[in-house]
Amino acid sequence: MSLINTKIKPFKNQAFKNGEFIEITEKDTEGRWSVFFFYPADFTFVCPTELGDVADHYEELQKLGVDVYAVSTDTHFTHKAWHSSSETIAKIKYAMIGDPTGALTRNFDNMREDEGLADRATFVVDPQGIIQAIEVTAEGIGRDASDLLRKIKAAQYVASHPGEVCPAKWKEGEATLAPSLDLVGKI
């Protein structure tokens, strides 16, 4: 079943953010764009490169009104230990949610049950809590925060411009499309 255009389910998890442990629920996402950035595990190999890339783009994400939630099935304590020991992870200013029971990961239908780990997946959620974009890659394939930014800008544009769609590789300021009978077969 596709989760596109479905509402995120209620959740309550502990997280590590800016040197503190905090509780995060679905209510924290209301009224704001959110990215749930699932990754398999702390202290691994591809994961820190991705999380560091998102950290490098975090200021721009914040300017777009986007909150980022990194999620793995590690505990919030493990997130703190990783944050304290890795120069790359120490750059992170967004919330790192611990999901040791896997409940949040299962809410997004993103659990590798045989391993108890999250798949490498990104979910873009609109201010109403509706999933607008999903990207899932194999464990050995890292994601690109630049493309995540592009997708968020496209999702925000489409949300504020009903009747328009963003074509492949669309970037902010470029032409969009207005689907109509006249356009059929002309692209």
UniProtKB/Swiss-Prot annotation:
The keyword Acetylation applies. The active site is at residue 47. Disruption phenotype: Increased sensitivity to hydroxyurea, probably because more reactive oxygen species accumulate. It comes from the Bacteria. Its main location: cytoplasm. Keywords: Acetylation, Antioxidant, Cytoplasm, Disulfide bond, Oxidoreductase, Peroxidase, Redox-active center. The modification N6-acetyllysine is found at residues 17, 93, 153, 169, 171. GO terms for cellular component: alkyl hydroperoxide reductase complex; cytoplasm; cytosol; membrane. It catalyses: a hydroperoxide + NADH + H(+) = an alcohol + NAD(+) + H2O. It is found in: Cytoplasm. Induction: Repressed by sulfate or cysteine. Homodimer; disulfide-linked, upon oxidation. 5 homodimers assemble to form a ring-like decamer. Thiol-specific peroxidase that catalyzes the reduction of hydrogen peroxide and organic hydroperoxides to water and alcohols, respectively. Plays a role in cell protection against oxidative stress by detoxifying peroxides. Is the primary scavenger for endogenously generated hydrogen peroxides. This is Alkyl hydroperoxide reductase C.
